[in-house]
Amino acid sequence: FVRNRLVVVTPADNPAQLRRLQDLAKPGIKIVLAAKEVPVGQYALDFLDKAEVDGSLGAGYKDAVLANVVSYEENVRSVLAKVALGEADAGVVYSSDAAVSEGDVQQIEIPDALNTVATYPIATLSDSSNPDLAQQFMDYVLAPAGQQVLEKYGFIGAGDK
């Protein structure tokens, strides 16, 4: 019913002056990622793997970025908080998390070819105690008005590519 994608975030004042993905590989940049045991952490590593194979961000990009990682956090909110507070120069988070922190962080887009899109399904449970209400919720979320609400919060709507 909705999808999410990765973005790189920097503190709002962006003291490291990061403007493009290549800047993450500069020596001395402090990066935080989520631990690989959580989906966003694995997706961040997938992005680096794709960038390494693609080559468009430069040879040795993955190793250079990983050398700049100062911590692996247990969840995406911790990554976002460390960046927003200026404890790190950059982090990789979901676009939906960055959207709700507008003003606290800046975003650097990750191209589709290097990104991983998380897909969230929706369904009513067969043993739901209120199947009619569950269906009404699904109908709303999948309708244009519901999709607009989700897009406002940084998600990719079901009909968008």
Language model features: what each stretch is:
Residues 2-161:
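Exported/periplasmic ABC-transporter solute-binding proteins
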